Amino acid sequence: MTATYMNSSVPFMYDSYPAVAPERFQGQLQGKTAIVTGGSSGIGRAVCKAFASAGASVACIARREPRLKTLVDEIKAEGGKAIPLAVDISEKDAAKKIVSQVEAELGPVDILVNVAGIARLGPLVDEPEDLDIWWKVHEVNVRAPALLTRAVLPSMIERKSGAVISVSSVVATWPSPIQTAYASSKAAISKFHESLAAELEGTGVLSFALNPGSVESELGAPDDAINTASQHPMLEKMRQMLKSPRKKQTAQLPADVCVALVCDPRCKVLNGRHVEAAQDLSPVLEEAEKEGGGRIGKDRLYLVNIGIL
């Protein structure tokens, strides 16, 4: 089903569609190894299954081992290859340990998808003065993906091939009250990928940030995701919005877009961009392939951008 998005003429998608359909890329990643964080639920779980369906050997990373084992059993039952690694990615040396174990069991890493993330809702003025919980959002949403990226890059650069994708959010580009931690972390990860793509130019390694759309997830599930000590009126509005029965994107949609970004050679023109999973990729690619990148290049679209007079 399609609709419009932010007054854009590009169709707005809620589920997988022909341009990113799994059957397009089935088996294309045979012999490739992928690491996916946040694999025990939601988008991360769907991404693990999508890359396995495309033929990759997948290291499924999350904290909840029973859920990971169930996921890996499902992947194997469907003919795929996967291993579970129960790790808290925010822990010291987690990235090195993950990459070392994956390389030992599955081989060199070709694809990294950073899905794991946490949120924090509440006004900055009501946060504890040490901002420890606030900074934890950046530890998980920015530092951990950066460390994992740093750990996989040397091998990718040496082999002149690879792709790193991190899940960002629409709040990276919109003013988002009571989300200073989450919004700034997502703006940071989108800018991280833009800068990374520039410094990796010519290496064969691709870099993308991805706004998955409005997908049902456990992002706000932890007890400290909402600052319950705050009485800010926006908190109640946010609670009601999160509970509202509005139509959302399926987890399969961003998962399939991740695979398309890696498998479809046309997607190289979006290297370094903040890709919108809920937009039909076909017209976006057509515009990006025009001389100078069309409007996307001229107006610096799909980037965390500050315009000036």
UniProtKB/Swiss-Prot annotation:
Keyword set includes Cell membrane: no
Database matches in Gene3D superfamilies: NAD(P)-binding Rossmann-like Domain
UniProt-listed InterPro entries: NAD(P)-bd_dom_sf, SDR_fam
Top-level class of the enzyme under EC nomenclature: oxidoreductase
Keywords (A to Z) from UniProt: NADP, Oxidoreductase
Molecular functions per Gene Ontology: oxidoreductase activity
GO cellular component term, pick one: membrane
SUPFAM superfamilies the record matches: NAD(P)-binding Rossmann-fold domains
E.C. code: 1.1.1.-
Binding site for NADP(+): I43, R67, D88, R150, Y182, K186, V215, S217
Pfam families: adh_short
Entry annotation: catalytic residues: S168, Y182, K186
UniProt pathway: Secondary metabolite biosynthesis
Family: Belongs to the short-chain dehydrogenases/reductases (SDR) family.
Role according to the record: Short chain dehydrogenase; part of the gene cluster that mediates the biosynthesis of an emodin derivative that may be involved in black Sigatoka disease of banana. The pathway begins with the synthesis of atrochrysone thioester by the polyketide synthase PKS8-1. The atrochrysone carboxyl ACP thioesterase MYCFIDRAFT_190111 then breaks the thioester bond and releases the atrochrysone carboxylic acid from PKS8-1.
PANTHER family: DEHYDROGENASE/REDUCTASE SDR FAMILY MEMBER 7B, DEHYDROGENASE_REDUCTASE SDR FAMILY MEMBER 7B
Protein name: Short chain dehydrogenase MYCFIDRAFT_6125
Organism: Pseudocercospora fijiensis (strain CIRAD86) (Black leaf streak disease fungus)
Lineage: Eukaryota, Fungi, Dikarya, Ascomycota, Pezizomycotina
